[in-house]
Amino acid sequence: GMIQSRERAKALIMAGVVFVNEQKVDKAGEMIKEDAKVEVRGHDIGYVSRGGLKLEKAMQCFPLTPNGKVCMDIGASTGGFTDCMLQNGAVKVYAVDVGYGQLAWSLRTDERVVNMERTNIRNVTLDMLAEPIEFFSVDVSFISLHHIFPVAQAITTPDAMGAVSYTHL
C-alpha cells in the first residue's frame, strides 16, 4: 500500500493530510471505494506515529534532549517516541510496552532499539538493563503514574530527564 502501517495511516489521517476524491478524510475507519483517488498532501509527520510529534513539541518547549543518551520509551506501542529519540541522537532506546507486535518494523530491526514488549514497567529492574537510563518518556493511559515514577527513579541516573504524556481515562 501507500503507507507502511495502519498506525502510520491513522496518524496521517488525524494530521489532516489525507484526501479521498478531493475531500479531506477525518475518520480512520471510513470505508472508501477501491477506485477512489487517495492523496497524501502536505508534510509527512516524520515519525512512525503521532507520538513522535508529542515528544518533539516537548523538546521544543523544555530543555530536554535524548542526544547521546541511553533512553527508555515507557508505553512504546508503535514507537513514535522511540523514533523521535533516535532521530534526535539517542544511542539506545529501550521500548517498553505490555502489548506485543505493535512496534514498527523499522524500529524492531534497528540495532539501537531494545524491544521490551510484553513487559509491564512495574516489573522492570536495573539488572534487566545493560545500563541505567539517562532520558525517558512516558505515554500511558491504563496505569497510574504513581506506579511508574518509583520504577523510573530506580532505573535512571541521578541527572536523568524525562517527558510525560498522560491520559487519565
Question: Model-derived features: where do they sit?
Answer:
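Conserved SAM-binding loop of SAM-dependent methyltransferases across substrates and taxa
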Residues: 80-88
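A basic, amphipathic helix-loop patch mediating RNA/tRNA/ribosome contacts
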Residues: 1-36
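A short, conserved alpha-helix within the catalytic core of class I
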Residues: 143-151
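Conserved small/polar residues in nucleotide/adenosyl-binding loops
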Residues: 167-168
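Conserved class I S-adenosyl-L-methionine
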Residues: 69-75
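S-adenosyl-L-methionine
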Residues: 100-130
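Short beta-strand element of Class I
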Residues: 91-94
